[in-house]
From Swiss-Prot:
Reactions that this protein is recorded to catalyse: a phosphatidylglycerol + a membrane-derived-oligosaccharide D-glucose = a 1,2-diacyl-sn-glycerol + a membrane-derived-oligosaccharide 6-(glycerophospho)-D-glucose
Highest taxon of source: Bacteria
Ribosomal protein keyword on record: no
CDD domains in the record: LTA_synthase
Enzyme class: transferase
SUPFAM superfamilies reported in the protein's UniProt record: Alkaline phosphatase-like
InterPro entries: Alkaline_phosphatase_core_sf (IPR017850), OpgB (IPR020881), OpgB/LTA_synthase_biosynth (IPR050448), Sulfatase_N (IPR000917)
Predominant subcellular localization, coarse grouping: membrane
Gene from which this protein is expressed: opgB
Pfam families in the cross-refs: Sulfatase (PF00884)
Pathway the protein acts in: Glycan metabolism; osmoregulated periplasmic glucan (OPG) biosynthesis
Enzyme Commission no: 2.7.8.20
TM helices/strands, residue ranges: 3-25, 73-95, 102-124
Protein name as catalogued: Phosphoglycerol transferase I
């Protein structure tokens, strides 16, 4: 298919210069296609699977803590491709390539080839895949398959779960990687060694692999395009995961990881599902660990696993059953990192001097050392050790080699009473890891969420089986049910709580939020990004409910209260105010049937300050100059406390020079003062200069 795409792009280029008719339109369309393909190429290098669920998740989730510097080479190539994508526009400036004949036929051929190019490109494939995965489906048939553990544990053994970052079992292949992982290879002969373990959709990146293995469900965001990590108060509140179950059984759950726990919502997941302690990179900074022990992603694995050993001893001495979970980091794609403990260690390979191979060799030694310490300790007899890859390796310096191998995840279980065996699965995935551990703890337990024990010969239907059959035709039903775990299914009542969050079902969401319901008033989509644009462009057969400050809906609202605009399928509307939202409103309640005005174009807040600033109490004059601004009056306000408290607000009209002056009175010091304007999505404002003037002193400029 790649050669077909290359040929079609070449033909498009020839058709572009063949005729001047609609030349700029053709050049623009070709450049747009090339830009999209360039963006896809960058995403594919990062995800290893084009635009998939992981891509969408990380775009919506908090990206703080990502080691962006590791991908500088990919980004540089992407910038070069962007510049190359603009070449069709430059080409039109070369007059000699333009031929004034056959304009209509040439343009028709150009359109046909453009459609062919899209059809054979990965853009169409990934778009089709995402459509099938995210389209509404009836999940009712799989609801009975979602099972939570209820049976009490008779023997409460301690658990140590070691996730190896991208440390797939494929690296065990002695023909390709001789002697690369001798320690884990030896441990596999002493363990329950699970083979052919795959990663299904919604489990192929770190947080998704953890959710899949510990909850038995694929990770999807809540319905729609919401930034689930930054705006959702709870992480999968309707899911019941391994940590929840073990906590109910009297366990203490302890996590130690080297990366930032806020990245992709990992810390939120753990805190929401039974973990008592979550230590991340900040914990190691607070301990005073020297900078030489950190990479762009966080603390190195030698320091991390030493801390895990210390935690194991401390938890064991306490006498309470526990699950200690740790996640390594130094084998992260694309090139890995080498801690000080392995600086003098090298892996000699016919493949060459590849840094990632050194990192894998080091990780094998460090994990093997931790496991040996635990097993040889006086607490080892009462401990089950799980060694697992969080997911298959993403594109890295060994991608060309791995592409020729049979890829499989790593999953080992070691314990005193666990007889070694190799379990070859026919349709197993990381969704089944937690259920398998539960059977080792309690033989009668074989399910966790949609996961099924891989040791059970009579396991009931599972999501893993559905993902492996008929090209995964029925797997979207499991994804659809997993989405409901973000909000629950009773979502027709809305209210705003004392923290200013919208309560929908079991979830708490920071507004602005647009909720779309189907014609049966079942929650269909949640929008938390570009909400005013979505509201203007969404024409639903059901009901829309938009919750934001009343300023978004009314010119005369200056009290900072919350309002909800509800629009039914007949375009009847009602604006609910703060007292109604405090009590709660039913989105399926009948609305006023009197003639309605056109649906309003709601406003959205636009930040004018570059960052929040600490400001002392006193009276100020806000002065700003806006080079680009709306032609009409608009609201400007000062806010604090994560934009939840409105300190000052004024309806402003810039003068001819774009100057705006507004008094701001602060009764007490504010740690996070920000200035914002309320505009609809078609308007924009560009601030050239902004200052807070206190008496005659000028505050810091932003």
């Amino acid at each position: 298919m790649h050669w077909i795409l290359a040929l079609s792009l070449l033909l498009l280029l020839l058709l572009l210069v063949a005729s001047p008719r609609l030349a700029w339109l053709k050049a623009g369309l070709l450049s747009l296609l090339l830009l999209l393909l360039s963006a896809w190429g960058l995403v594919d290098r990062l995800s290893g699977d084009g635009v998939n669920a992981a891509t969408l998740y990380h775009l919506r989730a908090d990206m703080d803590g990502a080691g962006v510097s590791d991908f500088s080479g990919y980004i540089a190539v992407f910038i070069g491709m962007v510049l190359l994508s603009l070449s069709p526009l430059v080409l039109l400036r070369v007059r000699r390539f333009r031929r004034p004949r056959g304009g209509g036929a040439v343009f028709g051929a150009f359109v046909v080839m453009l459609l062919v190019s899209v059809a054979v490109s990965p853009l169409y494939r990934d778009g089709k895949r995402l459509y099938y995965q995210l389209r509404p489906v009836d999940y009712a048939t799989v609801v009975p398959e979602y099972q939570v553990p209820q049976q009490p544990l008779q023997k409460r053994k301690n658990i140590v779960w070691i996730y190896g970052e991208s440390l797939e079992r494929t690296y065990f292949d002695e023909a390709t990687f001789p002697g690369l992982m001798p320690n884990l290879h030896q441990l596999a002969t002493e363990a329950v060694d699970v083979r052919n373990l795959t990663s299904t959709e919604g489990s192929g990146w770190t947080i998704a692999g953890m959710v899949a293995s510990m909850c038995g469900v694929p990770l999807t965001t809540a319905p729609g395009d919401e930034n689930s990590m930054g705006r959702m108060g709870l992480f999968l509140p309707e899911a019941r995961c391994l940590g929840d179950y073990l906590k109910d059984q009297g366990y203490r759950n302890h996590y130690v990881g080297g990366a930032d726990a806020s990245f992709a919502g990992k810390g939120s997941f753990l805190a929401s599902h039974g973990f008592d302690v979550v230590h991340d990179v900040n914990y190691f900074h607070d301990k005073g660990v020297a900078p030489k022990h950190f990479s762009a992603w966080g603390v190195h694995d030698d320091v991390l696993l030493d801390d895990a050993w210390d935690s194991f001893q401390t938890l064991s001495r306490a006498g309470q059953p526990f699950m200690l979970t740790t996640l390594t980091m130094d084998t992260h794609h694309p090139a890995g990192h080498l801690p000080l403990a392995c600086k003098n260690q090298r892996y000699e390979s016919p493949l060459g001097d590849i840094g990632l191979l050194h990192a894998i060799k080091c990780s094998d030694r460090l994990i093997g050392r931790l496991v040996t310490r635990i097993r040889n300790s006086r607490y080892g007899r009462n401990t089950i050790i799980v060694i697992a890859s969080d997911h298959l390796a993403m594109p890295n310096d060994l991608s060309d080699v791995l592409a020729k191998q049979k890829r499989e995840n790593l999953l080992l279980f070691l314990g005193k009473d666990i007889p070694p065996q190799q379990v070859v699965t026919r349709a197993g995935s990381t969704l089944d890891s937690g259920a398998t551990l539960l059977q080792l703890l309690e033989p009668g337990m074989r399910t966790l969420g949609f996961g099924r024990s891989l040791l059970a010969n009579d396991a009931p239907p599972s999501a893993s089986v559905a993902a492996s059959r008929d090209s995964g035709k029925n797997y979207p039903r499991y994804l659809a049910y997993a989405r409901t775990l973000w909000t629950g299914r009773s979502t027709r009542m809305l209210r705003v709580n004392g923290n200013g969050d919208v309560v929908v079902g079991v979830q708490q969401v920071r507004p602005p939020v647009l909720l779309e319901y189907d014609d049966n008033t079942n929650l269909k989509t949640v929008y938390l990004e570009n909400t005013s644009r979505q509201f203007d462009r969404t024409h639903s057969d059901g009901t829309l409910a938009y919750v934001d400050r009343c300023t978004a809906f009314e010119d005369g609202s200056a009290d900072g209260d919350w309002c909800a605009l509800v629009v039914d399928r007949n375009q009847h509307m009602k604006l609910y105010r703060d007292p109604d939202l405090t009590r709660g409103i039913a989105v399926d309640a009948p609305l006023d049937v009197t003639p309605q005005a056109p649906r309003p174009r709601v406003r959205q807040p636009i930040m004018l300050t570059q960052a929040a600033r600490k400001t002392e109490a006193g009276r100020y004059m806000l002065e700003l100059y806006a080079k680009r601004r709306p032609t009409r009056a608009f609201w400007v306000e000062a806010v604090s406390s994560e934009r939840k408290v409105v300190l000052a607000q004024q309806w402003v009209v810039p003068d001819a020079s774009g100057r705006i002056r507004m008094p701001v009175g602060l009764e007490h010091a504010v740690e996070d003062l920000e200035i914002r304007a309320w505009l609809d999505y078609t308007e924009e404002v560009s601030v050239d200069d902004l200052a807070l003037v206190k008496d005659t002193a000028v505050a810091d400029r932003s």
